[in-house]
């Protein structure tokens, strides 16, 4: 299977390495020229949760035209780069190509669908899955708990189960999920509660929850996000957002 990883940062390096080692034809693209040049000259080194090794056979480039059409595109950019990645993919992919993006925030599916058919798109959410870049050509795999994947329109399909299978075979812990939108929103509500307030107030999660005033502000965001989800008719697994977080 020809797989293209779009965005060869920390997470992209994990995806590219494991799929390459599973026997797939893997290409990876990134705009960070120093990183790409380092991989071309001395390979991609990945260490950590999935083991330590250096791979010299990864096809890397800064030009999407070098990759061309692929069976599967994995968008591994940060959220701000999703639309650009989708535009790149749209310029070379076919109607039979599948695109998967693993983003924990909202809106990735909508941004990608502007550049290709939403029927080609699979969404993913990572839980306890982390990685970091040590330097050009060198990444660290911090942890790998679970990736949930699902159809944009919901349901369990044959292609979703096929993707679950090839990700499993590459060493990932992956589960096909019937309602990925529910999962994305539930994670979003948690992020609204903790991520922004902790950043703004420069507090850890524990410190935030121990401060009555700041915690009340954080829960205001929780409740607002919950109300928006209800208006959008998202099928959440809870009715009390405060108890949930």
Region annotations inferred by a language model:
Residues 1-52:
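NAD(P)+-binding Rossmann beta1-loop-alpha1 motif at the extreme N-terminus of oxidoreductases
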Residues 128, 179-182, 245:
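Short, solvent-exposed loop/turn elements at beta->coil junctions and helix N-caps
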Residues 4, 27, 98-100, 122, ...:
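A structural signal for isolated positions on well-ordered beta-strands in alpha/beta enzyme cores
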Residues 35-38, 109-110, 157:
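Short, charged/polar "capping" segments at the starts of alpha-helices
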Residues 92, 115-120, 135-238:
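Internal alpha-helical scaffold of NAD(P)-dependent oxidoreductase catalytic cores
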Residues 29, 53-138:
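Rossmann-like NAD(P)(H) cofactor-binding subdomain of soluble oxidoreductases
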Residues 238-244:
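Short catalytic/ligand-gating loop segments at beta-alpha or beta-beta junctions
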